[in-house]
Amino acid sequence: MKQVNGEKLLASLGDGVKDIRGRITPDAPMDRVTWFRAGGLAELMFQPHDIDDLVAFLKILPEEVPLTVVGVGSNILVRDGGIPGVVLRLSAKGFGFVELAGENRILAGAICPDKHVAAMAMDNGIGGFHFFYGIPGGIGGAARMNAGANGVETRERLIEVHAVDRKGDKHVLSNAEMGYSYRHSTASTDLIFTSVLFEGYPEERAQIRAEMDAVRNHRETVQPVREKTGGSTFKNPAGHSAWKLIDEAGCRGLVIGGAQMSSLHCNFMINMGQATGYDLEYLGEQVRREVFEKDGIKLEWEIKRLGVFMPGREVRPFHGVTSE
């Protein structure tokens, strides 16, 4: 369903937008942004030129206008009805940097790919970042959800997060203030992460290269890295592996519409070509149902679902009652 509200929303922001240097796009297709390559339109998409431009935009954005932040699009599923309000997509030019910030320290912009941080660390003999080479996505998302791989989590290397709130005020959050747990932080969802400071330890480059090669080889062997996918679909329940539960429930390779649970790694949902947001979310909820009926375990989404459903194409979330 094509939205027609973007121009109206842009006009409502008044003359203040004339001073904005970033790109403002009404009715922006989200299927060009997400790694799933599916979903509806963003009513208005804003890509700030830099942090000052971001602050200026936030100060003219009315409080009642919804604001949704997306990173590189690797861990989100956008519904077919699109995303009302403003979608904030940080630009690579202003937020994609990675640089040294002192002995064994690295500062990375929120949109910087995780693997670029791993590469910077290796080039400078800084250990502890090899796991980032196996995580698809950007540093802001990794900091937000405490992303991890190969037994290492983001919180183990993170010193502080730099952020801006909805009013345009700047904040710095320490590791402790992030309130980390497994694939979660308690940081306010109103905060927009702009950069992250990390600290590693001295390590030989050859050793780091070997660790990164092992991560890459493992990922390419067991994950559908060349498919349209958002990464791990569900969190691992305590004491269990999500992929194993999905496999035991008979959902490996399960297809709904244009969406499939990967036959290579069944905790990865893939767009086989023409999947809609509805197909993907319906498939995920069906897997949650099948796993619960088999093992009594309720899987939690790791993929974020954003936006609104198309009328008549709503997906009912499974709440753990088999009679639903």
UniProtKB/Swiss-Prot annotation:
Q: What class of enzyme is it?
A: oxidoreductase
**What GO cellular-component annotations does this UniProt entry give?**
cytosol
FAD-binding PCMH-type domain mapped to chain residues: 36-203
Q: What is its EC number?
A: 1.3.1.98
Instruction: Give UniProt keywords alphabetically.
Output: Cell cycle, Cell division, Cell shape, Cell wall biogenesis/degradation, Cytoplasm, FAD, Flavoprotein, NADP, Oxidoreductase, Peptidoglycan synthesis
Superkingdom to which the source organism belongs: Bacteria
Q: Where in the cell is it found?
A: Cytoplasm
NCBIfam families under this entry?
murB (TIGR00179), PRK13905.1 (NF010480)
Report the protein's function: Cell wall formation.
From the Swiss-Prot or TrEMBL record, give the protein name.
UDP-N-acetylenolpyruvoylglucosamine reductase
Lineage here is: Bacteria, Pseudomonadati, Pseudomonadota, Alphaproteobacteria, Hyphomicrobiales
